[in-house]
UniProtKB/Swiss-Prot annotation:
<comment type="similarity">
    <text>In the C-terminal section; belongs to the IspF family.</text>
</comment>
<comment type="pathway">
    <text>Isoprenoid biosynthesis; isopentenyl diphosphate biosynthesis via DXP pathway; isopentenyl diphosphate from 1-deoxy-D-xylulose 5-phosphate: step 4/6.</text>
</comment>
<dbReference type="InterPro" id="IPR026596">
    <property type="entry name" value="IspD/F"/>
</dbReference>
<feature type="region of interest" description="2-C-methyl-D-erythritol 2,4-cyclodiphosphate synthase">
    <location>
        <begin position="240"/>
        <end position="405"/>
    </location>
</feature>
<dbReference type="GO" id="GO:0050518">
    <property type="term" value="F:2-C-methyl-D-erythritol 4-phosphate cytidylyltransferase activity"/>
</dbReference>
<feature type="site" description="Positions MEP for the nucleophilic attack">
    <location>
        <position position="168"/>
    </location>
</feature>
<feature type="binding site">
    <location>
        <begin position="277"/>
        <end position="278"/>
    </location>
    <ligand>
        <name>4-CDP-2-C-methyl-D-erythritol 2-phosphate</name>
    </ligand>
</feature>
<feature type="region of interest" description="2-C-methyl-D-erythritol 4-phosphate cytidylyltransferase">
    <location>
        <begin position="1"/>
        <end position="240"/>
    </location>
</feature>
<feature type="binding site">
    <location>
        <position position="246"/>
    </location>
    <ligand>
        <name>a divalent metal cation</name>
    </ligand>
</feature>
<comment type="pathway">
    <text>Isoprenoid biosynthesis; isopentenyl diphosphate biosynthesis via DXP pathway; isopentenyl diphosphate from 1-deoxy-D-xylulose 5-phosphate: step 2/6.</text>
</comment>
<dbReference type="Pfam" id="PF01128">
    <property type="entry name" value="IspD"/>
</dbReference>
<comment type="similarity">
    <text>In the N-terminal section; belongs to the IspD/TarI cytidylyltransferase family. IspD subfamily.</text>
</comment>
<feature type="binding site">
    <location>
        <position position="285"/>
    </location>
    <ligand>
        <name>a divalent metal cation</name>
    </ligand>
</feature>
<keyword id="KW-0414">Isoprene biosynthesis</keyword>
<feature type="binding site">
    <location>
        <position position="248"/>
    </location>
    <ligand>
        <name>a divalent metal cation</name>
    </ligand>
</feature>
<feature type="site" description="Transition state stabilizer">
    <location>
        <position position="277"/>
    </location>
</feature>
<feature type="binding site">
    <location>
        <position position="385"/>
    </location>
    <ligand>
        <name>4-CDP-2-C-methyl-D-erythritol 2-phosphate</name>
    </ligand>
</feature>
Length: 405
């Protein structure tokens, strides 16, 4: 299962890998899922991990004094995957057995504290992790767990009939991540008693487990309703907005032959030429930048550097095709596009219909969703002196099914 096109597990693991108090992360996986785990590690950026059947992972913290609350790395997690992300460990037949196997695997590291988190809680926040870690490090508790107050009425039900109502003032819903003294938790797991979570195991052995405030957003994906709620919260936005801008200088045309400039893919006869590395279509360049900006994919210069000879005199429709393909690959299509062309000459109005037709055909959208406007600067500035031409573009993209090869 994925959220925002990424495995559920990846969201929680990323938070743990980037947290300042976490020294190591180890994921417990089903032995039949190792290939999927490895493939995901190799293929995804930012060290996202693939989903595992046993939906939890371990992180360890070394003891730190109060004045030593400093990040593990000031550069973040990038480049540290080999040292911070440990190799996965196979789980057992039950959650508790998998926890025990994970704890056993950490003996060589011998951390002071261990954090156990359900990966099916993708909304764990750095604030929550930090609060738990500080409480544990500062007070040397045996265990610290997050919990939220129970706000609904709680009743005992038998055969769909309410038998009694339970006072809720002292009731709490326990969440993860949960932090414990590593050696004590491991020793109690070796007793092989069955418990629903690790805090229950510690309490059974008369150990004090401190409760701190949890977060409602840190809910567990258990039912279909939970999953639908998570998708609403975490899936990519349905719409994206981008803007683009481009400007080019006019230069004198050489010779007596007719000269043309190209705007929105349409040739316009004019006694000047556009100085540019490509064909100088300012409007298309602005549109390309708007689409790339909406996608978070940089700008036209990053993909088609003017220093590269292969783009010399290149038809700008090639750049527009590229941007449209990028949008499809990321699962977006153009909802509507607004272009403003600013110049004193030539006159744009006679060509607007042809411009709309060219742009809409290239982007594979109806021409009614493309608007082309033209204006002047009332003789002000370099454009007013007819030294060049510029264009602005605004685009709205909407989410469609992503393109899979």
């Amino acid at each position: 299962m994925t959220l925002a096109d990424k495995p559920v597990l990846s969201h929680a693991v990323k938070k743990l890998l980037t947290n300042q108090y976490i020294d190591y992360v180890r994921v417990i996986i089903n032995r039949n899922h190792e290939d999927f785990y490895r493939e995901t590690i190799d293929s995804l950026h930012n060290y996202y991990l693939s989903e595992a059947v046993h939906s939890f992972q371990y992180v360890t913290l070394k003891s730190r004094k109060k004045e030593e609350w400093i990040p593990v790395s000031s550069t973040g997690m990038k480049g540290r995957v080999d040292t911070k992300l440990l190799s996965p460990v196979y789980g057992g037949k039950s959650r508790q057995n998998s926890v025990k196997l994970g704890l056993e695997s950490l003996q060589k590291i011998n951390p002071d504290f261990v954090v156990i988190h359900d990966a099916c809680r993708p909304f764990v926040s750095n604030t929550l992790i930090n609060n738990l870690a500080r409480s544990m490090i500062n007070n040397q508790h045996t265990g610290v767990v997050p919990a939220i107050e129970v706000e609904d009425t709680i009743s005992l039900v038998n055969d769909d009939l309410i038998e009694s109502t339970i006072p809720r003032e002292r009731l709490r819903a326990i969440q993860t991540p949960q932090i414990f003294n590593f050696k004590e938790l491991l020793s109690y797991h070796r007793s092989n008693k069955e418990f629903t979570d690790d805090s229950s195991l510690m309490v059974e052995h008369k150990k004090r487990v401190v409760v701190t405030r949890g977060e409602k957003i840190n809910f567990k994906l258990t039912t279909k309703e939970d999953i639908n709620m998570a998708k609403l919260l975490l899936d990519e936005p349905k719409y994206r907005v981008g803007t683009g801008y481009d400007i080019h200088r006019f230069i004198k045309a050489q010779g007596k032959a007719k000269s043309f400039i190209k705007i929105c893919g349409v040739e316009i006869e004019y006694d000047m030429k556009i100085e540019a590395h490509s064909d100088g279509d300012v409007a298309i360049h602005a549109v390309v930048d708007a689409i790339l900006g909406a996608l978070g994919c940089g700008d036209i210069g990053a993909h088609f550097p003017p220093s590269f000879p292969e783009w010399k005199d290149r038809n700008s429709s090639h750049f527009l095709d590229f941007a449209a393909k990028k949008a499809k690959e990321k699962g977006y299509s153009v909802s509507n596009l607004d272009i403003t062309i600013v110049c004193e000459e030539p006159k744009i109005s006679p060509y607007k219909v042809a411009m709309k037709k060219f742009i809409s055909k290239t982007l594979e959208i109806d021409s009614e969703f493309v608007n082309v406007k033209a204006t002047t600067t009332e003789k002000l500035g370099s454009i007013g002196r007819n030294e060049g031409i510029l264009a602005h573009a605004s685009v709205l993209l909407y989410k469609i099914a992503p393109l899979h090869n």
